[in-house]
Amino acid sequence: MNGSSRTTRGAVFGSAGLLVGVALLSGCGSGDEGGSKDSDKAGSSDSAQAQSPAEAVQATNEKTTQAETAKIAMTVTTSGGQAQGKKVTGDGVMDLQDGTSKLTLDQGPNTIEQRVVDQVLYQKLPKKAAEQLPDGKTWMKVDLGELQTRGGGNKGLNDPAGSLAYTKSLSEKNVEKLGTEKVGGTKTTHYRVRLDLAKMAKGDAAQQKKLREQLGDEVPMELWIDDKGMTRRQEIELQVQPSGAEGGKKQKVKTVVELSDFGTEVDVQPPPSGKTADMTDQAAKGAKQSS
């Protein structure tokens, strides 16, 4: 049983690192309902260029989610402690409005199929790890909404129903324009953003304190936004406390997410319930131990 807990808990928090990048690009429709695809297409590159850096970053939330869906590619690199040099890559599709997604994740010889449906994370583990699941199950699941309720999730960071809505409250001093670059053949403007943890906590002092303990005083993020105002690449770097390493050295987790093929079809279903083991309790306990 202890071996099973360690194995599945590790899988959960491996996925949590990946969800950091995904979450910041998903569920953006939860804030504002305004806008349409037609109004997005009507936006010109001239109007985008006329915006200040802060205005461009604040507007990308609505512009990107108006596309509804996209293909996604991501890379998560961990450094520090025993995780030094670990790298996970993934690609798949995502609904940008509600966070529904399907990804194939690769770490060395191991491949994990990951789905998020209705704020529930599902992972089909590699064969050796799946042997540790109870009753011969092949999929594990974690209810991310329940995890957040129980203190195992960061609002706006690893909840796929969260959003980029915090960008609307950024001031000019939080955003720096770095220049222009091509991402996947598309011309973009590169911005550096520093997230304000006080604003992310939305006035919740306890949540702000927890965010600072987990992430530090500042969270650096970089965005590449195209001439239509849509996010093409996002890079975020976090200092996180690894599970089971209380008092140990924090690890640096760098997540890079790229979006392309906006409007692509996204059809994701949860795996059969008979093949799924609910690991939400283990994930919540592991999160509390690492907080």
Task: Describe the predicted segments one by one.
Residues L24-G27:
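C-terminal motif of bacterial Sec signal peptides marking the signal peptidase cleavage site
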Residues N2-G10, G29-S291:
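Subset-of-secretome marker
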Residues T8-V20:
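Sec-dependent N-terminal signal peptides
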